[in-house]
Regions:
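Glycine-rich phosphate-binding loop signature in dinucleotide/nucleotide-binding domains
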Residues: 73-81, 149-151, 186-188
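ATP-binding N-terminal substructure of ATP-dependent carboxylate-amine bond-forming enzymes
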Residues: 1-111, 142
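Short catalytic-loop micro-motif centered on adjacent basic/acidic residues
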Residues: 5-6, 83-86, 133-134, 170, ...
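A conserved helix-loop-beta module that forms one wall/lid of the active-site cleft
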Residues: 100-167, 174
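ATP-dependent carboxylate/phosphate-activation module, predominantly the ATP-grasp catalytic core
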Residues: 196-199, 203-261
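ATP-grasp fold ATP-binding core
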Residues: 125, 148-170, 188-200, 205-206, ...
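Short amphipathic alpha-helices within nucleic acid-binding modules
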Residues: 176-180
Length: 262
């Protein structure tokens, strides 16, 4: 029997779909504990009744509080936890800290930081021979304007550890960049990532990887691209899962996707 803790900071509908899928594995011998900062009543009763344990913490994004919460759940689940999981991207570094502290298998902090920090991720990808947009981690105005002159406009401005396309903007010239600097000034503790603007079709590559083996993957296309959606809120957008991904349009990502994970 496998004891799993699912970290669910907030009982959002999208997250609960994953929790509901996890509860189905109880028939296969899984025991499920849920760790959240929301009240138990925020979870639908039919779903909550399938939890083997539940623990609430003041802040489910804090590694120290999560660590204590996992220990509490372990006491309610036979004295051990075999896995700690969560689907929110901003949660991954904290979960990696919990696993390392408690000796639980799974992604460690270094690997989590590699994909959470987009500046670090691009440096690693480029070092491995995978092309990506030129970028600069911006902590002051001179760095920003220098990068703009070096790479040309437009530029993409975003947080280095964001999620989705939130707080992501396009600036078309130095005047717009100066305006961004006035409204959202970066600090050494809170830098901003600048990237050269690349246009084209945009895809995602999702993989199930176990101990370095890529067991399966899918490729989705954003229609239109996320940045275009953010700039034009009325657009009805979609994420398209193609039925056939064997053609030449997908050859490059078939090669680059596994290499990026390796």
């Amino acid at each position: 029997m496998t004891h799993v803790v699912f970290a669910v900071p907030f009982a959002m509908d999208a997250t609960l779909r994953f929790v509901e899928a996890a509860t189905r594995l109880r028939e296969e011998g899984l025991r499920l504990g849920v760790l959240s900062q929301d009240r138990p009543e925020r979870f639908p009763e039919a779903l909550r009744s399938r939890f083997d344990a539940f623990h609430r913490v003041p802040n489910a994004m804090d590694a120290d509080l999560l660590t204590d919460g996992v220990r509490q759940l372990a006491r309610s689940m036979g004295g051990r936890v075999d896995r700690v999981i969560g689907i929110l991207e901003p949660l991954q570094e904290a979960l990696a800290e919990v696993r390392e502290r408690l000796g639980i298998p799974g992604m460690r902090p270094e690997a989590a930081a590699n994909f959470r920090d987009k500046s670090r991720m691009k440096d690693l990808l480029r070092a491995s021979g995978l092309p990506c947009a030129r970028h600069r981690l911006w902590m002051g105005p001179e760095e920003a304007f220098g990068f703009g002159r070096e790479s040309g406009y437009p530029l993409v401005v975003k947080p280095p550890a964001g999620a989705g396309a939130r707080n992501t903007f396009r600036v078309d010239d130095e005047q717009e960049l100066a305006g961004y600097l006035r409204t959202m000034p970066p600090r050494p503790s809170d830098p901003v990532l600048l990237e050269e603007f690349l246009s084209g079709r945009e895809f995602s590559f999702d993989s199930v990887t176990l101990q370095g083996r890529h067991l399966l993957h899918s490729i989705n296309e954003y229609a239109p691209t996320p940045l275009e959606v953010m700039q034009t809120p009325w657009i009805q957008w979609a994420v398209v899962l193609p039925r056939d991904i064997s053609g030449p349009d997908y050859q490059a990502i078939h090669e680059a996707g596994p290499r990026a994970l390796d």
